[in-house]
A protein has these predicted regions:
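Positively charged n-region of N-terminal signal peptides that target proteins for export
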Residues: 1-4
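Bacterial N-terminal signal peptides
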Residues: 6-16
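Feature for soluble, non-membrane regions of globular proteins
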Residues: 21-238
Length: 238
């Protein structure tokens, strides 16, 4: 792999939409070259982006926002595969102790979490008019741990109003069984180890800025209006 160190440095400065500073224009062709090479080698593509076009037409979240969001998600998939390719090559060259390897290894979890969180998020949307069955095990667990559904929803909403970029995840502690609304900074800060993600809401600006400007509360209302509760309840093992 030619000029690997330059490509690695280029990757460190690449961005996905609204995520980080743009790539240096002189290094961009190298990153594109490596991405093109990996696209031609199926063995370097273990992850493929899912199609969520069925969500288009959702009330409260525009097609413009969704299409932009889909492209961003596809970028995380591409970068995850690209990182795997670079890390594999660095390992083959015996460069595991190099700063490039160590920084890209650190970056991998950020990109990978960006893939999986988006997949969980898109998958729990598309349920216009859907309601949580009050007799379901999930609803009963919510009442047990928060007192009422409304108290849980308020806590989830207020968690989504925390300043910063990230996610809100309703986690289940698989050992204690407890439900916990959790703030995730960016993609990788604050996850509950071993936790089971039940409901996921994206609160990066790209999820709502085009439709709601800085009105995050309006976006959160639209999110709840479109939750696919059938999918969410299936994530809860009871």
């Amino acid at each position: 792999m030619k000029q690997l160190s330059a490509v690695t440095l280029a990757f460190l400065s690449t961005s996905t939409l609204f995520a980080s500073p743009p790539i240096d224009s002189q290094l961009a062709p190298l990153a594109i070259m490596l991405a093109d090479e990996s696209n031609q080698n199926e063995s370097l593509q273990p992850y493929k982006a899912n199609d969520y076009s069925n969500l288009l037409g959702m009330p409260g979240i525009s097609d413009n926002t969704l299409n932009t969001h889909f492209k961003l998600y596809q970028g995380y998939v591409k970068n995850t595969n690209l990182l795997l390719s670079i890390l594999k090559q660095l390992s083959l060259e015996g460069k595991q102790s190099s700063p490039q390897f160590q920084e890209l290894k650190r970056r991998f979890g950020w990109e990978y979490d960006g893939v999986r969180l988006h997949e969980l998020y898109f998958s729990n949307l598309g349920g216009k008019g859907s309601k949580l069955d009050p007799n379901s095990p999930l609803a009963q667990a919510i009442v047990r741990d928060f007192g009422t559904y409304d108290a849980w929803k308020k806590d989830f909403t207020e968690t989504g109003m925390i300043r910063g970029i990230g996610w809100v995840v309703l986690y289940q502690d698989p050992i204690a069984g407890r439900l916990i609304n959790t703030w995730i900074g960016e993609h990788d800060i604050g996850h509950l180890a071993g936790g089971n993600p039940i409901l996921i809401m994206d609160v990066w600006e790209h999820a709502y800025l085009l439709d709601y400007n800085i009105d995050r509360t309006g976006y959160i209302k639209a999110f709840f209006d479109n939750v696919q509760w059938d999918t969410v309840t299936k994530r809860f093992p009871g």
